Amino acid sequence: MYPEEYNGYLLGGDKAALKQIIDNGVNYATELGMYVIIDWHVLNYAPSRHTQEACDFFAEMASKYSGHDNVIYEICNEPVGADWNSDIKPYAETVIGTIRQFDDHALILVGTNTWSQDVDSVVGNTLDDGNVMYVAHFYAGTHKENIRNKISTALNAGVPVFISECSICDASGNGGIDYASANEWLDFINSNQLSFIAWSLSNKAETSALISSGCSAKSGWSDGDLSETGRWFKSAISGR
């Protein structure tokens, strides 16, 4: 759920229609025995810009889905220009407090500064909640050992890390596939037993889309319906 961008929830979007999309997604995932993330897709700004609005949104979501053990809440996707100690953590404490009024055990994901690259910034100042994980993102064509080092710093300090967005192209979501870097990332993910989510399940004409731009089917995809990126990720998750 974009709060601002693309006719977002807070800036002109049809709130009822957007919440119906979420409800459909939760129901589909539940029927299939899958986890589903309700993501407040903060992008390029500090999450505290909309603290009260985020609380209102997550109060509604958590009250509705508190009986769903498969629902995960991501409360700020990719903050930018937001210090962990002075901005993101206080925001997270407030929003998490709201969610916990309705759901005391759901997993909550908290993004970190610089498009969720600075997961090491939480070391020594984590949140006082037993079911929170801290978010790291990567795009293999752009982000390499420097981001893995940040994740390792967090892991070595006992910080639980969740990769809630990644792909094997560059950070624009486009460009060529960097297979060498992608395989290095996959080795790192597997050796550290990290959960990851690929961006994105769409047929948009860009490298990161998992579905071929010529495919209009919404389910039941064959390997031929997948993009090169989609086929790589299918192979990456097979057998996990």
What feature does the model see in each segment?
Residues 2, 41-42, 167, 202:
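Residue-level "edge-of-site" marker
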